[in-house]
Design a protein with these regions (language model features):
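Short beta-strand His + acidic residue motifs that chelate non-heme Fe in jelly-roll/DSBH
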Residues: 82-84, 106-108, 125-126, 130-137, ...
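Tight coil/turn sites that cap or link beta-strands
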Residues: 77-79, 120, 128
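Non-heme Fe(II)/2-oxoglutarate
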Residues: 1-66
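Short connector loops at helix/strand junctions that flank enzyme active sites
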Residues: 67, 76-78, 91-95, 101-103
């Protein structure tokens, strides 16, 4: 996994550090991914506003594009996201992953490439390719993600 940019995520990490993920409504997906329901009174709007700075800095790399659909993904220790591809993703869209918390055993698998996405970096992911996550560590793996689309 090769990052395309460094990004300061300290304020986002500080904000999510006070969250008890078990308090958030969640969607339990196949493979055990914990996906907080982000559009709730429990704080997405506060978090979403904090992402504006990060998104603006990273969008400088994408001329003639706009950001679309911001998300937060949490994979708890010992849980995985099964191998899949996002069939509905259009060819002119890419996803930016911004790790907020991770560990050396939180693996991202994309086709036949496997690695750890490190906080403080931003990564491009073509979600039409087969991808999966396995968090074999003892801390949550939390990623802020957003899609980039051509205008």
């Amino acid at each position: 996994m090769i990052p395309f940019a460094a990004v300061d995520v300290a304020d986002l990490v500080e904000w999510i550090g006070g969250i008890d993920w078990m308090d958030w409504p969640q969607q339990n997906l196949p493979g055990g991914e914990l996906k907080p329901a982000m559009m709730t009174d429990l704080g997405w709007h506060g978090f979403g506003a904090r992402t504006d700075r990060v998104v603006a800095a990273l969008m400088a790399y994408f001329h003639g594009c706009e950001d679309h659909q911001r998300m937060l993904s949490v994979v708890m220790p010992g849980h995985s996201i099964e191998s899949h591809r996002d069939e509905q993703a259009p060819a002119w869209q890419t996803r930016v992953h911004v790790p907020l918390t991770s560990n050396d055993r939180a693996l991202f698998i994309l086709d036949n490439d496997m690695g750890v996405m490190r906080p403080g970096n931003a990564y491009l992911v073509d979600t039409r390719a087969v991808h999966a996550v396995h968090n074999g560590g003892d801390t949550p793996r939390t990623h802020f993600m957003f899609d980039v689309r051509q205008q």
